[in-house]
Amino acid sequence: MSETDHIASTSSDKNVGKTPELKEDSCNLFSGNESSKLENESKLLSLNTDKTLCQPNEHNNRIEAQENYIPDHGGGEDSCAKTDTGSENSEQIANFPSGNFAKHISKTNETEQKVTQILVELRSSTFPESANEKTYSESPYDTDCTKKFISKIKSVSASEDLLEEIESELLSTEFAEHRVPNGMNKGEHALVLFEKCVQDKYLQQEHIIKKLIKENKKHQELFVDICSEKDNLREELKKRTETEKQHMNTIKQLESRIEELNKEVKASRDQLIAQDVTAKNAVQQLHKEMAQRMEQANKKCEEARQEKEAMVMKYVRGEKESLDLRKEKETLEKKLRDANKELEKNTNKIKQLSQEKGRLHQLYETKEGETTRLIREIDKLKEDINSHVIKVKWAQNKLKAEMDSHKETKDKLKETTTKLTQAKEEADQIRKNCQDMIKTYQESEEIKSNELDAKLRVTKGELEKQMQEKSDQLEMHHAKIKELEDLKRTFKEGMDELRTLRTKVKCLEDERLRTEDELSKYKEIINRQKAEIQNLLDKVKTADQLQEQLQRGKQEIENLKEEVESLNSLINDLQKDIEGSRKRESELLLFTERLTSKNAQLQSESNSLQSQFDKVSCSESQLQSQCEQMKQTNINLESRLLKEEELRKEEVQTLQAELACRQTEVKALSTQVEELKDELVTQRRKHASSIKDLTKQLQQARRKLDQVESGSYDKEVSSMGSRSSSSGSLNARSSAEDRSPENTGSSVAVDNFPQVDKAMLIERIVRLQKAHARKNEKIEFMEDHIKQLVEEIRKKTKIIQSYILREESGTLSSEASDFNKVHLSRRGGIMASLYTSHPADNGLTLELSLEINRKLQAVLEDTLLKNITLKENLQTLGTEIERLIKHQHELEQRTKKT
């Protein structure tokens, strides 16, 4: 092959490897005048045959470079065919005898003219410079990309500033004590539990945020390193372009050298006649040398065949290893599936146990509600019994007082009967005194009865008021119970949110590990690229050495032109065989590279599957231990429930027995009260009848006095006895008649119980309806608020889903964060109450904690979005690095071929 052909091939190879635009330019250059140039180059082969005799290996490499370069251009195959035909024709013509020397001189003149035309075209063509400009103008490794990435990295630090602002605000603000709207104190158990849960939640979120900030810093540092390495690669590419420019300069120098050689060729024509005789002797020597070289080439072919067989054996072994790895992979996948199935079974069991636990808890709550209701009813009955006992005692005291007064009246009656005999003279005075006494006595009894009725009414009103107060207290108690239930529900919701956040944190940690693995892979790729760059530099040095060898070969070409023409045909055949063997070797090498890459991938996949299997086995053992613990706790709870149910049943039975006793006592007391009332009525009637008898007796005494004066005392005494008997019968009848209306009056009084005030009832109903409407409005508002929160949580879960269920939240915190927590807990304040188990500051209220939670959640979302953008940027960097690697591989292949 000639020097011009070599120069054109090297320049086209270098310019094609840079950008696709250079490929188009080179295609356009070679498509127009390709056939003429290649014909000229084939004719120049007759002049430059000495080089192939001295260095056949270089010639073979150049032929390979031409064949591998042709597919990059349109119409390259036809041009190659033309060059081959031209070279064969030139070889046929070049094998001239000593007599046809004049024809050879005319043909050499034509070749000189064509060579000068090619050189003019090469000088006029400026495509290497334009290609270099395009590579620098449209290079993908511009610094604007790196500037954008650095600006994004700087924006990540905004999350840290936001966290510092939140901490400063929390430490600077002093909040007043907040009263709970339900009227419950802070020391109650439910609020303490709720605050503890909120504190744990905030601690976990702070741990997560600090860990994410540290990871962001690490990503930033890695990103800056990657950008610096990218800039270094770009500088190396610039150096490569500079070296290519130097090569172009050397090509120009070689063109000038070719012109000088053409001049020397003209001078050598005169010397050819003298050298013709010496050439024949040299040809014989060359025949001997070519025979030796043919033997060496045959040996090399045999070695290549042996290497080919060894590569085939290696390929078979690689296939066996790949099949074994596939089998192991399938077994591991089966184990993973079984482990996943067992995990699902365990999760289903845990769900069933949790459902049973909830059901038992509900039964326990219902039993507690029933026991409280029974206790309240018992308390009511006790109060009623106490009120009845007080009433009975009061009635007994009143009866005793009336009995005493009745005894006094009997004594007075006895005294009056004794004094009747003495009262004859004082009859007028006694009549007046008796009448006054009777009037005063009747008035006093009427006053006493009225006072007793008024007291009864007052006591009844007080009883009604007490009953209303008790009902109000019961309503208040029910409201408090409802508020407690609402607090329990909120506590459960908070616990569920905590669980979801923990799972999200696990996912975040898993993605962090993935990004770290990707970064390590990128580092390995960069190290490989550095090694490849060093290899390329070594190859450049070897290329310089080859250029020196080229110059030496040019000197040898002048001495060995005529001898190479006779041996071109044999060398071409050998070269074709060697090219075929090398192509096969390259294909086998590519195949072995693919096998090694597949083996590495399979090994990495098997390692990852083993790690996943270990994780699954650990999680399965943990779940089994948790299931056993849950079973033990369920057994304990069931035993406790049974014991409590038995105790409550015994208490209910005892209370029912006490109720029955108290009811019997109440019935007995009520019967006693009714009997006492009847006795009171009878005694009143007796008093009235005795007063009537006394009045009649006084009248009879007056009549007796009148009769004594008239002298008919005895007759009237007898009539007096009959009258007294008749008056007694009449008194008995009148007492019976009086008793019946009084009994009816008492029954009417019992029936005419003081009616309940309807206005009070209506007002109370209105109040209850208003409270019910307010509660309904609150419930509707809370439902809408819950729906909005659920929608927000669903949106946020889409962002965080990939970061959940992989790492435990306890492994996120570092020693530095623990020291900071200890320092803040010693200083006191809101942050100290977050980091400790007990509230260190009274300013930490529910509203404040919710605001802190919202701010921290916003910061967490920002950090997650920034992590996602960083991941995308890393992916783009990976694609660019892969492109660089491909570019370097192409350059290596071209340098090897050249």
From Swiss-Prot:
Q: Tell me the first and last residues of the signal peptide.
A: none
Q: Which residues form a coiled coil?
A: 201-712, 759-803, 855-894
Basic and acidic residues bias: start-end ranges: 703-717
GO annotation terms (biological process): insulin secretion involved in cellular response to glucose stimulus; response to bacterium; vesicle cytoskeletal trafficking
Compositionally biased region (Polar residues): 82-95
Kindly indicate whether the keyword Transcription regulation belongs to this entry: no
Q: Per the record, which residues fall in region Disordered?
A: 1-43, 68-95, 702-749
Which InterPro entries does the record associate with it?
A: CCDC186
Keyword annotations for this protein? Answer: Acetylation, Coiled coil, Phosphoprotein
Where in this protein does the record say N-acetylserine is found? 2
The biased composition feature labelled Low complexity covers 718-734
Q: Which domain of life is it from?
A: Eukaryota
One GO CC annotation: trans-Golgi network
Residues with PTM Phosphoserine: 740
The answer on whether this UniProt entry bears the keyword Acetylation reads yes
Q: Which GO terms describe its molecular function?
A: small GTPase binding
Q: What is this protein called?
A: Coiled-coil domain-containing protein 186
Q: What is the protein's species of origin?
A: Homo sapiens (Human)
